[in-house]
Structure formats: C-alpha cells, structure tokens
Amino acid sequence: MTTFPASTDLVVGPGFQKEYLPGYPTNPTSAMLDSDFSGRTVREIPESDFSLMIGRFPAFDYFGDGSFYLLHAPGHTVGHICGLARTTPNTFIFMGGDACHHGGEFRPTEYIPLPKDVPAAPRSRFGGGCPGSFLVEKIHPQSNGTTPFYDIAKGFSHDHDEAKRSIGKLQEFDANDDVLVCISHDQTMVGNVDFYPKTINDWKEKGVQKSIRWAFVGDFDLKAERPPPGEAEEADYSWLSAAK
C-alpha cells in the first residue's frame, strides 16, 4: 500500500477496520502494518451500501455511473472485496483479488469444461498443446474435466465456507465470454496483457481471455503419476506440483 502516495484513499470492505486496525506494532496481533495506513484515509464501505446484485455478488456502484463496481466477496479475509470494471459498453474485467490464487482453483467447471485440446501456453512444460484427456486421466485428482483441479485448504482462509462460496460466484463470471477474470497471483497474465500506463480495454478484441484461460495447466508436472487405488486419501499430492 505504501507504493501509493498518502493522498490515495484506501478503500476496504465491511469489517476490515475492526479486524485489522490499528496495525502492528500498535496492535501486536494485527496482520497489517501501521505504516500502511499512516497519513492515509481508510474508507470502509458498509455492508448496507452493497445494495445491488451482480450475478450472485452484492455490489456497490463506486462512481454511481456503472463504470466500476465493488463486489462483496468475503472468505479469504474479513472485508475482502473484488472489483468489476467496465471496459466497453458490453465487456468487463473482474478483478478477483485473493478470492483465488491459481487458475486451477476455479477451472474447469460445468460451464467451461476442459477442452479436447488445451492450447500451448507460456511457461508450459508440455512443449505445445496438451490433450484434455491427459489432464483428466493423469493430473486431475478426481479425474474430472468439469471441476477445478484444486480445492482451497482449510485454515488458509479466514472463513473457509465463505471463501468457497465466493469462488463459486466468481466461476459464473468466468464462464461469460464478455468478462475477463484476473486474480492477484495469476502469472499467466504476464506476457498476455500490457503493463500500466497502457490500457486493457481491448482485451476481448486481442483474445486475451482465450490466451490465459488454460495457461495455468503449464504449471503441472509432466511426470505426474496418480496414487495407486486405495491410497488416494493418504496420498501426498505433491505429484500435483506447481512450478515456482
């Protein structure tokens, strides 16, 4: 947060200030730092202001003109919010923040199942495209082409059940060809989108969604082997490893 000048307000979701402020060292148990908020206005959007519904997310029209919405997406942390920015009259970018941390946490789904052929992707260990059947048979823990590869671990989120619900809501946006879903730790964005101050309004025209949708499968280990039958419950799932 200190990247931005103190004149930049910090906008947070419901319950954030009570949970995290003051920061450390004033509050030794806080996960935030006092320096993050020093001289800065912290604006918490109350739950009552999320009076719209976009998809299944309670939403707040930030500027009042339909150009940018904050979405109440609790679970990962108290007050976690996502952003939905209009890029053209009919297209949007969904900024998922920490609702997910890897594409395999919310893809594939019944809305967008694994395709027959997954195209080549940057950082891919496959050296080119990959048959969807290989991913289902050799990589996916449940051998299922319509459920995500990963499930969030219990204890990782502030509220595990809420976090899973927020992911379910995000998946519905991800299935829309007019919405580009971006999450904070998605390395597949690098090389597929331009850096600021360039714009991303023409993402659909450039085919960005198609380029990144399955790029995350390039993280999986080609030498993966499924645990023997009957050992799945106790298996070490390091075989579903991600590149660092």
Which residue ranges define each predicted feature?
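Residue-level detector of short, conserved catalytic/binding motifs and their immediate flanks
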Residues: T8, I81, V179
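Cap/insert and terminal regions of metallo-dependent hydrolase folds
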Residues: N90-K244
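Surface-exposed beta-strand edges and their flanking turn/coil or helix-capping segments
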Residues: E19, P25-T26, G83-R86, P108-E110, ...
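Conserved beta-strand->loop/alpha-helix structural units within folded catalytic cores of enzymes
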Residues: M1, H72-H80, L170-D174, S184-H185
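Catalytic core of the metallo-beta-lactamase
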Residues: P46-P108
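Generic marker of "main functional regions" within proteins
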Residues: V11-P14, Y20, H72, H80-G83, ...
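Metallo-beta-lactamase
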Residues: T3-H72, A120-H158, E162-R165
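Residues that form ligand- and interface-recognition hot spots within folded domains
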Residues: P14, T87, Q187
